């Protein structure tokens, strides 16, 4: 099981139209966990049952495009993608929030590491 985050972006649309499309998408896709939106972008989080990460990435890259007609989504493109395994996703949810980048060039131990 993979936890996928897709960010899409494109030409400005009424934010209410984007929200309505995401609501339709959530009815079509039971694995959709959450979505955020604005007039020029949206971010989706969902579970994927692909056998391997390559399958999850491939599916994620076509996810928005494949649902454009059925959910009446904006003609936006994927501009960001993250796929992590179930253990990584769950670990992130239970650990305190920490800035992704503290300083450029910084090298630090990962949270939950066994140093």
Would you name each region that the model predicts?
Residues 1-115:
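Long, contiguous binding/interaction regions
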